């Protein structure tokens, strides 16, 4: 169905090259904006309106676009609106938790076209690539989606990840660290690998509480503290893609040992790990707590979510734990706020669901440690995207990667837009 250009494309004219390039830009703009008019597209593409209409008509005939009706007029004739055909192409997104992964298929308008399925795997699973491949094939088959219409696969996972190389350096077995290469060999499509916290942040930035802002900080607060940094609308990844390791900034001299091998990291005093350590100490010390009483026969079954629920029911011990980690995170955020002066900070992840039980101590730390003029203009809000931010962020990122790779400058690499949408 989809073919890369054959050697004959080297004879393609400059005019045809420009036309193909413009069509690709139309697809990218409509994916980003949802729908728009010919005049708005012409302005964005810096081409004449008649030229733009020719491009749109070609894409409608090819089945990529559709006319969705008449828009509002700002004066004069009401414009015709255009949008992508929903079923023209898809991407698969996969979001890793600690001991499982969630996968779903999205259409070109970023809508779920499949339920989220859970895969029993983890980043050190030697069968990881095989399991993701089989799960994706089954998901596509179950929902009648042809592999020819799938542009690519996006995967977010914990670890030190070089997204450009597709390498996760946290995977213990070095021969499996290049997970991007392994998945590309399985899928034979574009594959994008990135850190889970960055994709949570990208989802929030594109679709959630940070959508209207250019300078934003998004914290995914769970077993670690993942950080997404947006400056002037751009996601900051750093030289090798390792930016945002907020969990491992040093906070306590000679503090508790962190999983990274260092002592006193923020993660040791402000994460789900901290919550579970305090609960363990509570059981050992016979602390008075409804939570301790409820789980006295099965202390290993307590989760951070149980602690938050008990705090909402007035359990003072659980409230004190959330207060402790909120104060610690607030101290960490004080450095971020004074260094970057963001427009907004968004808290996502399981611990953020504690809401006022962590927001109040965070603000208390900021009041004590930050310059007032800086901190008073930085709102801290709780995400309302739940567990969907990473999947949505990853799906959008793979779309953007595919569209970026479609901007070929060498005629030999061109893919004919008159045939269906390209995949790798």
Features from the language model and the residues they span:
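Short loop/turn motifs at secondary-structure junctions and domain boundaries
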Residues: 83, 94-97, 210-211, 218-221
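ATP-binding/phosphotransfer module of carbohydrate and carboxylate kinases, centering on a glycine-rich
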Residues: 1-68, 74-76, 81-117, 123-148, ...
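Glycine-rich phosphate-binding loop and adjoining helix at the ATP-binding site
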Residues: 112-215, 357-368
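Hydrophobic beta-strand positions
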Residues: 105, 160-161, 229
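Glycine-rich phosphate-binding loop of actin/hexokinase-like ATP-binding domains
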Residues: 212-270, 419-424
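General beta-strand structural signal in soluble alpha/beta enzymes
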Residues: 67-68, 191-195, 229
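Short glycine-aspartate micro-motif
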Residues: 91-95, 150-154, 216-220, 226-228
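Residue-level recognition of short loop/turn positions
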Residues: 62, 109, 164-165, 232
